[in-house]
Amino acid sequence: TFSFFQSLIQMRCFFNNSNYGSYSQESIQKLNGEQVKEFAINLHKYILENKKSGQELKDGQKNTVDLGYYLVTETSSDSEGAAVASTPIIVSVPQVSGDSWNYDVTINPKDNTPILEKNIVKENQRVKTSSENIGDVVKYEVKASIPVYQKNAQNIMYKFTDTMSKGLTYDEKTGFKVTSGDKVFAKDTDYTVEVKKQGDGETVITINFVYENIKAYAETGITLNYQAALNKDAVISNKENLGNTNNIELDYTNNPHVKDSYKKLTDKVTTYTFGFGITKVDSEINSKLLQGAKFSVKDAGGKTVAKYTYDEKGQVVSLSGNGVTNSKGITTFLGLKEGKYLITEEVAPSGYSLLKNPIEVTITANKDESGNYTGAATIEVSNGNKAGQIINDISENDGNILFNVQIENHAGFSLPSTGGLGNTGFIKIAIILLSIVCVLAILGLGYTKFENSRKTKN
């Protein structure tokens, strides 16, 4: 919607007024292109401060007007993309068109559209999604343009609101780094940061800028860098769109001359993490669940990475040592990124032989056509160990969904390759048995000599 003004009779107080550029009716006829823009801004300021009204012209509407010069201002902007209203412009009727006059004038306001883009920074790449272990740090980058308003614009809002889901812990110690090119903005001078923990576990961070301090950097825009850690409250799933989101909103003034004229841009990134349970069963009767088996989970580099599990109450807790199968034959390992993992049975259930070789499983996260993770994933036994197989998922009471790796044990006794008796035990037993044989042999030899001696005497 536009308003346009013509009558100079209503604007006598505008001319020769130092508050509005000290223009005269004669001087405005000699203005060049840039000076005309400045004149339009000052004239608009006068109209606002003196509450002058103009004729309204809606988008696409055609009005008949007298010949002359008009100040055209955008009073609202419903443009797609949340555009900022264009600055006031001077329009003449008619306009020169080649060698003739054009009396059918079309006004095309030049709205500027702010840009907001949020990414995860991973290995020097900017991505919308990532796969992480619980405890890993997720680095964020937000880039946004800075809207440009006319010089007399006041009370400009430029504010970011970042919402982290409960599975993300904001790193307050590191905080925000706010830059524009080589310029580093100062907290509490150029912007303020307010952090609030919500009842549902979300963290809401508000970054409010002093527009006067950043407007000179409109050409390069603004960049926010900050980070969070994936925590034990993270959503763990292998289904689409179930992840740990971080949303960003940019609220900004759309038209500084219209009360409460604000627009909002949004963007988000998502981090996914996975987990699996181990169900320990008898090799002959799979319905027989085995308690007391102890397992470790390591990545392909041999590092122990599974550090969280469910306790008996269904709460996510830190895993101390190995995972131990409960009365249902299950132990869980939570918060794992995609990749290969080695499951090693450290202690077998009572009455069962120890699993000889580790079971390697590979978690593969699905991606869409753009290369972004979808949240869906698959798991497979990837080293051919037939003692392990993938069965139906485990659904936890908190909504998390885990893969399920069923591992069989054979009844019987086995000696572990490390720990327990082991080879040392065999050596000790062999030495003891050999000692007994030697003693018996000596006793036997002594007895024979005694008998022979007794017979000789007789």
Regions found by a protein language model. Give the residues of each.
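Solvent-exposed loop/turn and edge beta-strand elements of beta-rich ligand-binding domains
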Residues: 1-458
